[in-house]
Amino acid sequence: MNLFAEMRALVLECVDQMVTAGQLPADLNMTNVTVEPPRDAAHGDMATNAAMVLAKPAGKKPRDIAEALAQLLAADARIASAEVAGPGFLNLRIAPTAWRAVLLSVLDKGTDFGRADIGAGQKVNVEYVSANPTGPLHVGHTRGAVFGDALASLLDYAGFDVTREYYINDGGAQVDVLARSVYLRYLEAHGQEVAFPDGTYPGDYLIPVGQQLKDLKGDSYVGQPEEAWLQDIRTFATDAMMDLIRADLKSLGVEMDVFYSEKSLYGTGRIEAAIEDLKSKGLIYDGVLEPPKGKKPEDWEPREQTLFKSTEHGDDVDRPVMKSDGSWTYFAPDIAYHYDKVSRGYDALIDVFGADHGGYVKRMKAAVSALSDGKVPLDIKLTQLVKLFKNGEPFKMSKRAGTFVTLRDVVDQVGPDVARFVMLTRKNDAMLDFDFDKVMEQSRENPVFYVQYAHARVASVMRKAEAAGIAVDMDTLKAADLSLLNHEAELGLIAKLSEWPRLVETAARSNEPHRVAFYLYELSGVFHGLWNRGNDVPELRFVQDDPKVTQAKIALARACSVVIAAGLGILGVTPAQEMR
């Protein structure tokens, strides 16, 4: 039950009545008519801009339309009052019976309350993490993993058919560097002293990989030239790193549907097919790009290259796809990979990149636009840096990696639930401070604790009621006399619950799962406020002498915990039954 959607439908119904009565012209565009929470809660429960939107096309004063609308709206049993404000805004107060219907809907649907169908089964591919398979995931990958996973869950909750995908960057030179680094650990496992040249990977995480290689191959690679072992160790090391990465992701509660290998694009004709598709559309040509101003990108050459006319699809400059020596640029396999995604029949694509890939956005969007003839939108979400603090100081070192803090470092210290929630307490493109001490504090300033405490409080009050012999099973709560909930603080909590379905749709349309975390914090604040008022106003306490009153109040508390559980489920966080 989406009360905001119901009220918007009611507003449009009243507009139709005005059209029928000759008060408004027919064929008005209703697209921009909204019903939403007012900026100032003192003005009402909801507000509509209908009169302001329709005034100009109708050739009438907005206030005149608003006053006529107010009369029609006030006749509906769900509306307690409809008041015109300013030049033509319309503020609505919802009748208590309508609020109680929302509460009953929450109890009836459980965590499906708020589940939407705006996706209508459209296929969406969400690609995230996609870290180079050269070592354990670091804290930056952690943020991308959590954001992408929560976004995928949000879209699933909103009715989309979602595929979670990881692109394995196993086709580039960095995997050769990994193989050489593993070879050094392999020699070390044979008792040799080795030095790690600049540019190799010296982290301790490769020590067991070197030992595993020794166990598998014995001394067959010792003293051999690079060409004798590079390709074998390349494959062995990549597989070992992907096992490590999969384990890292699992520790965070992230599981992918698809792992797609970049290497599979080479020697299979897939890159050639993608470039040929662009060529058939007149978007590939040979030419020399103007020297770029400032820092020169690695794919620029002062010679003729094969170029993609990305400027015809919104990019700033055309992009090289083949170098003058006939080898592919790093952009070419990315084009081929997205060509494959388009070919798999997705209705929309989402890529989650680190902020350092900001310069890649326009060219990638141009490629997908060209490959899909503008039919498949690509949204690229950038996740900003995470700054870690411990004991008030920046925290930068890792025993595992030697140079950076790993995902496992974070999960081991605070657990997956805290790590996931905190990563969503800021919009993805805003810097995030992660303080290991503060995220474990039991205070309002710690949003993880604040939300989990609300859920745990409901569980505790239900246990208390059961101990007093009061039935609080779901069937009993659904049958409770909800008319006993009439205090403005109780109705205010229901009003906040009513925002959940609208919030889900808004967050899903904008691909912004952080909105769920923000809402849960606000909802928990309203719940804690009601709980704390019970200290001064005894009739607001959830457990009363009268079992029927207790059941009604616990029905409200239970509905709150249901919505919190639904939101935490989207974020990939397990709701707490008690605080420890």
Curated annotation (Swiss-Prot):
**Predominant location:** cytoplasm
Cellular localisation: Cytoplasm
Question: What does the UniProt keyword field contain?
Answer: Aminoacyl-tRNA synthetase, ATP-binding, Cytoplasm, Ligase, Nucleotide-binding, Protein biosynthesis
The record's listing under InterPro entries reads: aa-tRNA-synth_I_CS, Arg-tRNA-ligase, Arg-tRNA-synth_N, Arg-tRNA-synth_N_sf, ArgRS_core, DALR_anticod-bd, Rossmann-like_a/b/a_fold, tRNAsynth_Ia_anticodon-bd
**Can you supply a Gene Ontology BP term from the record?**
arginyl-tRNA aminoacylation
Give the multimer and partner information.
Monomer.
Can you name this protein? Answer: Arginine--tRNA ligase
Q: Which organism is it from?
A: Roseobacter denitrificans (strain ATCC 33942 / OCh 114) (Erythrobacter sp. (strain OCh 114))
Q: Which gene encodes it?
A: argS
